[in-house]
């Protein structure tokens, strides 16, 4: 708990910054945190603002908006079970460079030290066991975004990745009785399956607070088993992706309650991840705006020529584009969406906790 106390001290000593620069740094001010929280609560009522004991309140936040909370979020399988299978997706090299800040791949490309996956533009990612054999078609954009997030988080790690493989056997009914007992045997088999599923069920209370030291949201997890008994930190770590649990997860006292142990997702790299995610979303909106304008223009018209000139101005490295990105426009991401995008990022760290239903807002 020494790290938890040091973190609390750092939060206390860091001065509050009220300047708004989330588009360029990925950081937000307390006022922007409240604004983004209001939007999250409005769009998704399972999230609610809450207060906390007076001695734990942050004076720069409203007393009734100290923390965002959603309760009893289900988790039916552990993280290592969620990523039982693997699949490969080919993505554009420019998108890889964008997600990595144009650093990792460019360096590897210059030195010729790419491994097989990097050389051919492949990224390996996990696949939910529930998706196996269903014939479901995956959305390439969604897969690409998740892979971008994985690459960003993995950059912060030191040493080699450790793979964890866990297999759990489940009991099955024999069903070998006489014909007049067949239905009863089937009922018992179904009961065993239901009981086995219930024993795996966990529920989480999720808390989002504002970190003054990093100027980003910070997520805390408090878990319970199927009987409502609080989970130990080691048990909660089972619901965090094994690639990240030793890199970004920390055992801390919940800062908005007394004597409550939680697991936090450390926010040291949140701002850089958020900056790249917002850049992706902004580029997508710019592309949609141009496509919409093209639909309204007739081929061969003077307006069409103007549209083509506009597309050229949107090319990478254009000074005019750089100036426009500094000014608010229809393609810019508003701060209201910050926490929605933040939860999209967190979903890759805690894949088995089923709270990532915010994607329709983007």
Curated annotation (Swiss-Prot):
Superkingdom of origin organism: Eukaryota
Pfam families: Autophagy_act_C
Active site: 268
Subcellular location: Cytoplasm
GO cellular component: cytosol; mitochondrion; phagophore; phagophore assembly site
Biased composition (Acidic residues): 146-171
Main location, first listed in the record: cytoplasm
Keyword annotations of the record: Autophagy, Cytoplasm, Protein transport, Transport, Ubl conjugation pathway
Region (Flexible region): 82-198
GO molecular function ontology, one term from the record: Atg8-family ligase activity
Biased composition (Basic and acidic residues): 129-145
Chain coiled-coil ranges: none
Disordered, as annotated region: 101-186
GO biological-process terms attached to the record: autophagosome assembly; autophagy of mitochondrion; cytoplasm to vacuole targeting by the Cvt pathway; glycophagy; piecemeal microautophagy of the nucleus; protein targeting to membrane
Region (Handle region): 272-337
Domain notes: The N-terminal region is involved in phosphatidylethanolamine-binding and is required for ATG8-PE conjugation.
Record's function text: E2 conjugating enzyme required for the cytoplasm to vacuole transport (Cvt) and autophagy. Required for selective autophagic degradation of the nucleus (nucleophagy) as well as for mitophagy which contributes to regulate mitochondrial quantity and quality by eliminating the mitochondria to a basal level to fulfill cellular energy requirements and preventing excess ROS production. Responsible for the E2-like covalent binding of phosphatidylethanolamine to the C-terminal Gly of ATG8.
Subunit description: Monomer. Interacts with ATG8 through an intermediate thioester bond through the C-terminal Gly of ATG8. Also interacts with the 40 amino acid C-terminal region of the E1-like ATG7 enzyme. Also interacts with the ATG12-ATG5 conjugate.
Family (UniProt): Belongs to the ATG3 family.
Protein name, per record: Autophagy-related protein 3
Organism of provenance: Lodderomyces elongisporus (strain ATCC 11503 / CBS 2605 / JCM 1781 / NBRC 1676 / NRRL YB-4239)
